[in-house]
Amino acid sequence: MTERPPEDEAPQREPWDEWVVEVLEEIKEEALNHFDPRLLTALGNYIYDRHGDTLEGAGELIRILQRALFIHFRGGCRHSRIGQSGGGNPLSTIPPSRGVL
């Protein structure tokens, strides 16, 4: 019996550039809910000046927006339940462990 590589039974992926554009649109929509649109426009212009209309520029913009949103949520976004007492911590109903360690 001869060895054969496994057949690709996974669903076809969409092309990389379409995926990057979709992710960028989603993260831009989320960023608009949390940051001043003028700031986002300035950031977009800066990235465009450095990279033009390229996938590399889109990737850099995604990375910057992901980091900014992460720091924003971690600092206590008022639109998020993460990191703020006003939104409530979903894990606060779990009693603390006693004498486990």
UniProtKB/Swiss-Prot annotation:
Q: What Pfam families has UniProt attached to this entry? A: VPR
Positions of the UniProt region annotated as Disordered:
80-101
Any idea which residues bear Phosphoserine here? S80
Keywords in alphabetical order, please: Activator, AIDS, Cell cycle, Host nucleus, Host-virus interaction, Phosphoprotein, Transcription, Transcription regulation, Viral penetration into host nucleus, Virion, Virus entry into host cell
GO cellular component terms, A-Z: host cell; host cell nucleus; virion component
- In terms of superkingdom, the source organism counts as Viruses
Q: Where are the transmembrane segments?
A: none
Q: What GO terms describe the biological role, i.e. biological process, of this protein? A: symbiont entry into host cell; viral penetration into host nucleus
Annotated localization? Virion; Host nucleus
Q: Entry's InterPro entries?
A: RetroV_VpR/X
How does this chain assemble? Interacts with human UNG.
Free-text function comment from the UniProt entry: Stimulates gene expression driven by the HIV-2 LTR. Prevents infected cells from undergoing mitosis and proliferating, by inducing arrest or delay in the G2 phase of the cell cycle. Cell cycle arrest creates a favorable environment for maximizing viral expression and production.
Protein name stated in the entry: Protein Vpr
State the organism named in the record.
Answer: Simian immunodeficiency virus (isolate PBj14/BCL-3)
